[in-house]
């Protein structure tokens, strides 16, 4: 399931090109884009266009709430409920943001090899994070919303994996829990803490938390013929509509590439990453 802003038609198009329906069918995978209502102030998007997109591709689920950052938990829970009800026999539910680059084949291979059992959420675990108290940002959390100085462990919301049974438990608990607007924290932090659901860290190297690393990984596949182990990468701050297409095309054209050696570790040889890390110090890790 792909959380997508109602106006991000170019990103949805990129997902469909990177992973066309024929590929999804061959892997027994269902994809759904999760949208909300067009905000009243938004004049550049028309509902009839969204409905036409839905009729054409049959892969859109649109909620009755407004499209807004603070409603992302509702959107994620809507998707989890839809998946748990309609595909209760599915092995896994994968949630991604529409601007996240990921490899479906790589994710499938990883899950097959790991053979995870029981209720879980798997992704990039964030530990010891603190609430943002700067009211000028969209991540601002007031003391009334959350009084403690540290959040419980949770997963980055750009990509995570769970199961239908886990989703059902979370949906049931969410109805009885005070609402919190940070989707990844609410779903994979507060809910998992209350329900004692385990968080699983993606193996090292499978998640590229900074765009500089993803760009180097893609370039190495194209120009140096070195395989990229990552299955997930995050976009640049200013976005890149076709990033998921570029990433998947590079992976598929690199099936016979050489494996990356320890001496070629991305965090050592990626000059753009090393430069920015040196500039920002420990804040950039």
Task: Give the positions of each predicted feature.
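Secretory-pathway lumenal glyco-enzymes, predominantly type II signal-anchor Golgi glycosyltransferases
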Residues: 1-285
């Amino acid at each position: 399931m792909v959380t997508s802003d109602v106006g991000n038609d170019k990103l949805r198009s990129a997902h469909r090109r990177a992973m066309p329906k024929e590929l999804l069918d061959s892997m027994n995978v269902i994809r759904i884009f999760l949208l909300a209502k067009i905000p009243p102030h938004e004049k550049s998007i028309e509902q009839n266009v969204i409905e036409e997109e839905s009729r054409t591709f049959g892969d859109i689920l649109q909620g009755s709430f407004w499209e807004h950052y603070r409603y992302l938990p509702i959107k994620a829970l809507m998707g989890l409920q839809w998946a748990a009800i309609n595909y209760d026999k599915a092995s896994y539910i994968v949630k991604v943001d529409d601007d996240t680059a990921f490899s479906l084949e790589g994710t499938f291979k990883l899950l097959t090899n790991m053979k995870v059992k029981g209720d879980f959420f798997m992704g990039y675990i964030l530990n010891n994070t603190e609430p943002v108290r700067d009211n000028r940002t969209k991540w601002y959390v007031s003391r009334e919303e959350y009084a403690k100085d540290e959040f419980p462990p949770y997963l980055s919301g750009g990509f995570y994996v769970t199961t239908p049974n886990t989703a059902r438990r979370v949906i049931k608990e969410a109805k009885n829990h005070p609402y919190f607007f940070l989707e990844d924290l609410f779903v994979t932090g507060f809910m998992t803490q209350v329900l004692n659901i385990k968080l699983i860290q993606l193996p090292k190297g499978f998640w590229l938390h900074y765009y500089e690393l993803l760009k180097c990984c893609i370039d190495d596949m194209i120009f140096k013929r070195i395989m990229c182990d990552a299955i997930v990468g995050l976009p640049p701050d200013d976005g890149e509509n076709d990033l998921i297409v570029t990433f998947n095309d590079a992976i598929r054209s690199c099936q016979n590439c050489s494996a990356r050696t320890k001496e070629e570790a991305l965090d050592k040889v990626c000059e753009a990453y090393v430069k920015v890390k040196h500039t920002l110090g420990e804040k950039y890790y």
